[in-house]
């Protein structure tokens, strides 16, 4: 959808950052409509907000591990998970001891995704992950999401207007207009800028 159509509001509502005014949110056969964001996170929902929102004074590794510090029990080894994440994002391992503020926009986006992955969530919400990032990094992130979706059975809910990223994801797309779902289609159907403008009302 174009700007102001309710995409970010929907993502924040799913995550529990905004209260739902009507309807119900169900995850793993459980009604989580009134559950806290922390409960939803513990249940297996990760969130990468628009604008990344990393902690600029913490190191890259501290940013990634921050969610771990808030938990006491794990069904996995946090250190093993960290190494797995570093294998996905080598630049983060290279810069693991530098402050988040020193990273480029594309590196910060990788960091935000890595932070969401550290708890091995089943669903990850990403709000405009390609915003303000150079095309090569957009392609890299698209490959990561596509591979994780195929190989680890994770579900990604992605808000995006970047056509190149959408085309990398073999997924269902929905069009939102003022909070209403008006169309459902495959990402392969949005394969040109012209088509996207027709469907999503995008403009230069």
Please identify what each model-predicted range represents.
Residues 23-31, 43, 77-82:
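Conserved ABC transporter NBD signature motif
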Residues 128-129:
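Walker B catalytic motif
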Residues 15:
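Helix-to-loop junction immediately C-terminal to a conserved catalytic motif
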């Amino acid at each position: 959808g174009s700007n102001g159509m309710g995409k970010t509001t929907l993502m924040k509502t799913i995550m529990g950052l905004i209260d739902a005014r009507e309807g119900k949110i169900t995850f793993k056969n459980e009604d989580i409509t009134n559950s806290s964001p922390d409960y939803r996170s513990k249940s297996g929902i990760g969130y990468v907000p628009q604008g990344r929102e990393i902690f600029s004074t913490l190191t890259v590794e501290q940013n990634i591990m921050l969610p771990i510090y808030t938990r006491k029990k794990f069904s996995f080894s946090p250190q093993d998970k960290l190494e797995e994440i570093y294998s996905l994002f080598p630049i983060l391992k290279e810069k693991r001891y530098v402050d988040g503020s020193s990273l480029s926009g594309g590196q910060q986006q990788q960091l935000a995704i890595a932070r969401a992955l550290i708890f091995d969530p089943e669903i990850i919400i990403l709000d405009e992950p390609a915003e303000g990032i150079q095309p090569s990094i957009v392609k890299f992130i698209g490959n990561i999401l596509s591979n994780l979706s195929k190989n680890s059975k994770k579900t990604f809910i992605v808000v995006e207007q970047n056509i190149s990223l959408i085309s990398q994801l073999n997924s269902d797309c929905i069009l939102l207009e003022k909070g209403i779902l008006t169309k459902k289609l495959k990402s392969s159907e949005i394969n040109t800028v012209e088509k996207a403008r027709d469907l999503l009302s995008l403009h230069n």
